[in-house]
Amino acid sequence: NFGKVIEPLAETFRVACVSYDGFDETEQTQFPTMIEETAKIEEYIKEHYDGKICAAYGCSLGGSFVGLMAARGVIHMDYGILGGSDLDQSAKLPAKLMTALMLPMIYPFLTTGRFRLPFLNRKLEKWRKAGDGYVDAFIGMMRGAGVDLSFITKESLRNQFYSDLITPLADAINPAGTEIHILYALKMGEKYRARYHRHFAHPVLHELDMQHEELLAVHPKEWVELIEDICRQK
């Protein structure tokens, strides 16, 4: 996800990248639950950084982890930065139905780069041709450049998708000494503004006239500059 920005970030910060259980080709693991995975991240930060870091950034699912760490208060971060995460939540039954519907579509695409249903591949190709490079850049960020993801199991993807939906994120999260910043892609829709303000007491919204994670996927240099600007505020 962050291949284009790690080196420039490392010029200013000590960078640690999180790989989730079940999504790292160097391990034979399955993704457990959001809470278990959050606890593992927190334990690593406690062991290697005395429980204190300058900033944590997460996009999509990663933003849920940043929110959970901010709410739990096990570790301290000066800045919690979310990259336009949707923070969707659901009761267990609807979450099971949604997972059952989405898994047959997402899993083949994630592991092979192709949907099982031909009309979805045609639709994707149409988006690619009509777009300005965002679709290809986003897919490249999600799947990696030429990376073989066939090691990811359906169980890991199922656990990740379902657990993210049913794991509650508190409202009015306001950890002492932590600023919450959100890279808010306006093209995602106005409902997310209200969602961010519900879950976080004082979020700083960086409004971008872009689509979900477009800044990171298409404009990595500008993304790095924004992250550096955020982390210079204290």
Predicted regions and their residues:
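Post-His helix in hydrolase/transferase enzymes
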Residues: 216-231
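Flexible "cap/lid" loop of the alpha/beta hydrolase fold
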Residues: 71, 79-111
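Active-site loop/oxyanion-hole signature of alpha/beta-hydrolase fold enzymes
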Residues: 16-57
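Conserved loop-alpha-helix segment in the C-terminal half of the alpha/beta-hydrolase fold
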Residues: 7-8, 179-213, 219
